[in-house]
């Protein structure tokens, strides 16, 4: 049995299946884990979700994913709280025969996946530097509970698009909308933050070097990586294609290599401890 952790798919079905073939994937033995953003902008979101949901139905213990910002955007569009953009290529999903299955799949998908035996944690954007893995799990469990409640789901999706609060405060209550919003932002939108651990959204078009001139740094420069090392955990994340999967922090692995932007799809072979990034790019004509 092998464990493979995939970077953002974004509906790049052909590259995904080509990479599965490249690693000699055996659905009866191997485990697949995804860093989120299974859909959004890519050419074949229906095929991508059909394959993943079918595999999960057959092998529920071997297929795992976390929610990404594009996955949550799809839920918000479905419920009428956000307008679909043509570039996101969601219309084919919204008109698909299995639409309700996709909605239930994403509503049951957590923000964080942790395997204590394999000593791994997977989150779309990462884990807020102030939190340990146990604390992060507690916070994400709150959102999983929210998404199981029809009314709370609508409240969250209707109000999640805001840049505040931009930092965590211990007095935030589990029933507080600001608390919900911060959890979602930290796990699905986070890239940069200040030394005071204030999340930054104003440097999204800057390089890391440019942001550092304004004393803004990658989230993984702070705090919790040392906690992961102490616990012998490794954290895997996607979301940040501009990094090209370059992260120099021990016990933190970046996996988004920008397949949907014309680059390649990557995965990490856990048992071999190696990143697999063959240049498989399917050209559509």
List each language-model region with its residue ranges:
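N-terminal active-site segment of His-dependent metallophosphoesterases
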Residues: 1-57, 72
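Active-site neighborhood of phospho(di)ester-bond hydrolases with catalytic His/Asp-centered motifs
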Residues: 6-7, 32-36, 65-68, 123, ...
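Active-site environment of divalent metal-dependent phosphoester hydrolases
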Residues: 10-14, 40-42, 70-76, 239-246, ...
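Short amphipathic alpha-helical segments
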Residues: 17-20, 46-47, 77-79, 134-135, ...
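A general structural motif
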Residues: 27-30, 60-62, 122, 232
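Short hydrophobic/aromatic-enriched beta-strand-loop microsegments
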Residues: 28-29, 83-88, 255-257
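Active-site neighborhood of divalent metal-dependent phosphoester bond hydrolases
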Residues: 42, 46-49, 54-174
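Acidic, His/Gly-rich catalytic cores of divalent-metal-dependent hydrolytic chemistry
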Residues: 137-285
């Amino acid at each position: 049995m092998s464990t493979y952790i995939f970077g953002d798919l974004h509906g790049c079905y052909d590259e995904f299946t080509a990479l599965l073939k490249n690693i000699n994937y055996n659905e009866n033995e191997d485990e697949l884990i995804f860093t989120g953003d299974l859909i959004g902008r890519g050419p074949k979101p229906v095929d991508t979700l059909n394959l993943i949901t079918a595999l999960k139905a057959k092998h529920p213990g071997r297929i795992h994913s976390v929610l990404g910002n594009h996955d949550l955007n799809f839920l918000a569009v479905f419920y009428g709280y956000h307008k679909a953009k043509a570039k996101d290529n969601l219309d084919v999903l919204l008109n698909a025969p299995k639409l309700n299955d996709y909605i239930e799949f994403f509503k049951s998908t957590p923000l964080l996946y942790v395997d204590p035996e394999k000593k791994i944690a997977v989150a779309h954007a990462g884990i807020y530097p102030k939190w340990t893995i146990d604390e992060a799990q507690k916070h994400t469990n709150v959102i999983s509970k929210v998404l199981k409640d029809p009314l709370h789901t609508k409240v969250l999706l209707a109000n999640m698009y805001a840049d505040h609060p931009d930092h965590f405060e211990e007095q935030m209550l589990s029933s507080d909308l600001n608390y919900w919003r911060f959890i979602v932002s930290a796990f699905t939108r986070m890239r940069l933050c200040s030394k005071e651990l204030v999340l930054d959204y104003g440097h999204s078009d800057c390089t890391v070097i440019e942001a550092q001139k304004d004393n803004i740094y990658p989230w993984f420069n702070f705090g919790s990586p040392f906690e992961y090392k102490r616990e012998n955990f490794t954290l895997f994340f996607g979301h940040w294609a501009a990094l090209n999967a370059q992260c120099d922090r021990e016990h933190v692995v970046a996996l988004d290599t920008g397949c949907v932007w014309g680059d390649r799809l990557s995965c990490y072979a856990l048992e071999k401890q190696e990143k697999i990034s063959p240049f498989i790019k399917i050209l559509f004509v």
